[in-house]
Design a protein with these regions (language model features):
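Leucine-biased recognition of intrinsically disordered, low-complexity hydrophobic segments
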Residues: 18, 31-36, 310, 318-319
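Bacterial N-terminal signal peptides
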Residues: 23-39
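General secretory precursor processing signal
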Residues: 12, 25, 42-43
Length: 332
């Protein structure tokens, strides 16, 4: 097959004062040119966007509170009818991640966020042969999160700890689809429901984009300014010990700048792919870290349960891992 020609595109990143070169297929060049310009225009977080996102998070908290009542399904997999539920449990125990896109509504209506996009995803993984205490201790080992979650977390530090509440610092870093880094602070609260169930809620208190993402000590851009790739983030963990291990579920709710409607048809699938990859990496890194803590053997990045979106390695027999489609069904 003949390779398609590419254009070298040079455009200015106004948030960093740099000129950037990239290559894209000729067929998409003229379609993407306006979007490339928009992506490099600085975005500023507005109060109306913050208020709408806070409203979405409040509604999500209320929904999750109802889901955690005694007798309610603890994991989203438990809400599925049989035999689909048992099939997914079997796949989880074989090493598969189950990931789906979520959406909190009010009175069957979407919660609109002006000038912003909400990225809400839920994922579940199973870690065999470990206890709930071990899984929770890994999540609370914040000084070593840079080891557990590298390269996505470049720096980490526990700032304060009182009872079941932690204040932490994390420096996020990604080099794809474009290089970006953030200094962030979170407040995390843990609740032990009973001997086999625990939950946590992490809410961002501060997110600032770095002016030069390749430099860990780079000056920050003012909070709420920059490219607008990440303005707010909340993560909710649920841990359940059963079936000889621990099921881990994480809900991630993030806020970013919006995408102009004219480009949504092209950009939204890319956003979904990146969001799904990010959550898959979070779950897989957590599982790998818990397994390493439980066995005393450091699991490498060649661990056989790698999500296919994160590696080109051929899956190991009987440990083929897939990511669930948005409707909860495994991808074909």
């Amino acid at each position: 097959m003949k390779a398609s020609k590419t254009h070298g595109v040079i455009f200015r990143d106004v948030t960093r004062g740099l000129w950037v070169r990239c290559s894209i297929p000729t067929s998409a060049f003229f379609l993407l040119l306006p979007f490339l310009a928009i992506c490099c225009i600085a975005a500023e977080l507005k109060q109306k966007t913050v208020d709408a996102f806070d409203h979405y998070v409040h509604a999500t908290d209320a929904r999750m509170g109802a889901e955690l009542r005694p007798g309610s399904p603890f994991l989203w997999v438990d809400s599925l009818p049989q035999p689909h539920r048992q099939r997914l449990y079997d796949l989880l125990q074989r090493g598969q991640l189950e990931i789906r896109q979520e959406k909190t509504e009010e009175e069957a209506k979407s919660i609109e966020v002006p000038d912003g996009l909400i990225h809400h995803w839920t994922g579940v993984a199973f870690v065999p042969g470990v206890s709930l205490e071990l899984a929770q201790s890994l999540l609370q080992d914040y000084d070593n999160h840079w080891r557990t979650y590298k390269p996505d977390v470049r720096r980490s530090k526990l700032l304060e700890h009182t009872d079941n509440t932690f204040k932490i610092y994390l420096q996020f870093y990604r080099d794809s689809p474009r290089r970006v880094s953030f200094n962030t602070e979170f407040e995390v609260h843990y609740t032990r429901i009973d001997a086999t169930h625990a939950i946590s809620r992490a809410v961002s208190a501060r997110i600032a984009e770095l002016e030069h993402p390749e430099q860990p000590d780079s000056p920050e851009l003012p909070v709420g300014q920059g490219h607008g790739y990440l303005w707010r983030l909340s993560n909710y963990w649920r841990l359940e010990e059963k079936d000889g291990g621990v099921y881990m579920q994480v809900d991630s709710v993030a806020l970013s700048r919006d995408v102009p409607a004219i480009f949504a048809w092209f950009v939204n699938p890319l956003i979904r792919r990146v969001s799904r990859q990010t959550l898959a990496h979070l779950l897989e890194a957590t599982r790998r870290g818990v397994l390493s803590a439980g066995t005393g053997v450091i699991a490498s990045n060649d661990f056989p349960w790698q999500p296919p979106l994160l590696t080109a390695r051929k899956p190991q027999p009987l440990l083929i891992q897939s990511i669930a489609d948005d409707d909860g069904r495994p991808a074909e």
